[in-house]
Amino acid sequence: MKKIVGLLIIAFSGVLNAQINPNPGYWQQQADYKMELSMDVKTFQYKGTQVLEYTNNSNDTLKKVFYHLFPNAFQPGSEMDIRLQTITDPDKRMIKTFKVEDKEVKESRISNLKPDQIGYLKISNFKQEGTLATIKVVGTILEVTLVKPLLPKSKTTFTLDFDGQVPEQIRRSGRNSSEGVALSMTQWYPKICEFDFEGWHADPYIGREFHGVWGNYDVKITIDKTYTLGATGYLQNKNEIGHGYQEEGVEVKHPKKTKTLTWHFVAPMVHDFAWGADNNFLHDKIIGENGVELHFLYKNDPEYIKNWKDMQPKTAELLSFFNKAIGPYPYQQYSVIQGGDGGMEYAMCTLITGKRSLPSLVGVTAHEMAHSWFQHILATNESKHEWM
């Protein structure tokens, strides 16, 4: 009898513990980035450095790590290019359609990009704890053989230099969009791949959704002073930058001899970093529920300014709705940035096309804003579970 009682107590304790901590074996990696880059707005080329503190919270010893090099997809012969040429239903934004002898032909826009139009991201000087590591690039994936295996529950620091070129805007990221936005900087930096209970998710980039590692970002972007930026995170030097970010009553003047500004953003606990920029952006800011700053960055186009102005209080209403329907938005800013080729969610921001009617603007903003909960808080693997 005592044995039976003892077993029941153990079993009950196990059930109680499971209720308190329903997934006691759960772990996730952490990637904390520090990046500095300079953008040449004439050539659309950029150079930068990255310091990544990577924490291995798994029970596995890692001998290799993998990074995404997303811009490499925008090159003739890339996996994304070949896919566009071989599937039956390619994205219409990514192809050209014409007729040859009365037969419709679909051609990948990537296949005709010239060297100064392609995207690329080149990595050099990759080090682990100050020692050069062996690297190999295959398409959009960088494979790194570690100098020293990364043990479970330990961390290490990786440093690298990167040299990139922004591709012609074909899908999501790119330069000179169809609406004239200069820079849609999404999936632009060397980004460590996710490692979870399934292993490495070093999926080649073919223009679809992404899966990322939680972490903190500290990013400094140096660019021509006439460009206004919207981005993931919080601008740290707003009274130095101006461009509509400065505190009320602060007047910001940049000396004539100043050619560039360095924008400093910090983003806590996100799994991506995106930004958009143009030298003809208007920037409006309103305060939403719980003091959340809502930023709106859009082209100074008289035909659409009224729609963008009228959309702003509607966005504040959307924030309140999602707060009540789902749960409080955990950050203190959200930016709606004109850019890209449709609409896509990123951490603390979205890039959307801006030449829309008011109902369309509100609709696409509602859709993308919802992703702030159902991707950028839950961090689901949309590469694997596309329905999510």
Question: Can you describe what each PLM-predicted range is?
Answer:
Residues S372-H385:
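Catalytic Zn2+-binding segment of zinc metalloproteases
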Residues E53-A73, D81-D89, F98-Q117, P204-E209, ...:
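Surface-exposed beta-strand/loop patches in extracellular or lumenal glycoproteins
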Residues G77-K92, D163-Y217:
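Glycine/proline-rich low-complexity spacer/linker segments in large multi-domain proteins
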Residues Q50-L52, N56, L69, S154-E168, ...:
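Short, hydrophobic/aromatic-enriched beta-strand segments in well-ordered soluble domains
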Residues T55, T61, M94-T97, E101-G180, ...:
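A surface-exposed beta-strand-loop module
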Residues M1-P22:
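Bacterial Sec-dependent N-terminal signal peptides
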Residues A18-K47:
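N-terminal, polar/Ser/Thr-rich
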Residues K191-G199, G207-M369:
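Hydrophobic helix-coil surface modules that form long, contiguous segments used
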